Each structure stands twice: as structure tokens, then as C-alpha cells.
Amino acid sequence: MKSLTLFAICCLISLSASAQSQNEPTRKGFVFGFSSGIANSHIKFPSKKQNNTNFALNWKVGYMLNPKLALLINGAVSVYEYDLSDRKRLRDFGGVFTSAQYFMTDKFWVLGGVGIGTDAPVFYDIKPENTVETKYYSGLGLVSSVGYEIYRKNNFALDLQARINYTTVNLPLGKTNGFTTAFLVGINFY
């Protein structure tokens, strides 16, 4: 009876170790991710403060240095309604950042980065005949986000993300800065 019990325990331990090794993520090599969701922008213009809720995008491209750490180029797009000109129009208050993403657990990750903050036209709301609308402005930008992978299979993962970014730019009317928070659903390939 003792040998049968010992044999059963050894089989269970072996099966458990095998199942755990199959569930561990295989993050290596190049990383690509894209997410979309909703963003809330708090922007302080020289003449007024503005709050907007609109569409958000995020993209990232990089390389896994090890199964827990990736170095990335990360883009954050947060659309807002600019109304300090002759017509209301949509613009992006986001940026492009060099960032590091670290997996605290096999599903939960944190990301931080610094780069170029932007105030740029949104391609689907440009009137090319108005040259003011086609101007890009840049400055300092910071990004921080957290995410949780809700589904993973092989080198594909689906995650939920919360992002905050700070941008400061010099517009023709003066220095403009603000925070944008976003909640996103993302797809990632490792």
C-alpha cells in the first residue's frame, strides 16, 4: 500500500510539474502589440483648462530581453476636441516613448517610459487647405501603464490595460501640458 501511495504521489508531482511548464509564457524575441479603448484628457492651455473623453490607441514594438523584461518603442494616442481656433477639430495629445515593460507575475505587467510628447492632427479630421490644422507640436512626454493578460495562447496574448501619460508642448498660444488616462483592450504577439 505504501509503494502504491508513493507511486501516486510521484505521478501527481510529475503531472503537476509538466502542466506548470506548459502554462508558463514563452515570451522571447520581438514584441508587437496594439490596443484601443477610451481616454480622458485633462489639458491646460494658457487661456483655459479643458476636459475631454474620446478614443485612445496604443502600440508597441520591441524586444524581450528575457521572459520578464522587454525594451519597447511605445506610442500613445489620446484624441481630444481642440476648440481654440476657427473650427472645432480633433487632435491627438499623446506621444512616442522609449519604455521598459516588466512582468511582475506571469500575467500582470508594468510599463514606464520617457520620450516625445505630441500635440498632432488626427488624420481623419484634417482640412489640408487650413495649414494651421496640419501643424505638429512636440515636447517632453512620460508614460506609465499597467496591464493584465486575460487570455494567452502560444505567442498571442489579450490584455486589459490602464495608461496615464503626461505631455508638455509649446503651441502658438503658449505652453500647454496635461495628463491623459486611458483604459484599453490590447492584443500582443511575443
Show the residue positions of the predicted features.
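Outer-membrane beta-barrel biogenesis signature
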Residues: 3-5, 11-35, 149-151, 155-156
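Predominantly the C-terminal beta-signal and adjacent terminal strand-loop region
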Residues: 25, 132, 142-190
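Residues that define the transmembrane beta-barrel architecture of outer-membrane proteins
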Residues: 28-30, 51-55, 90-94, 136-142, ...
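Outer-membrane beta-barrel translocator domains and adjoining extracellular loop/strand segments
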Residues: 43-50, 83-91, 122-130, 170-177
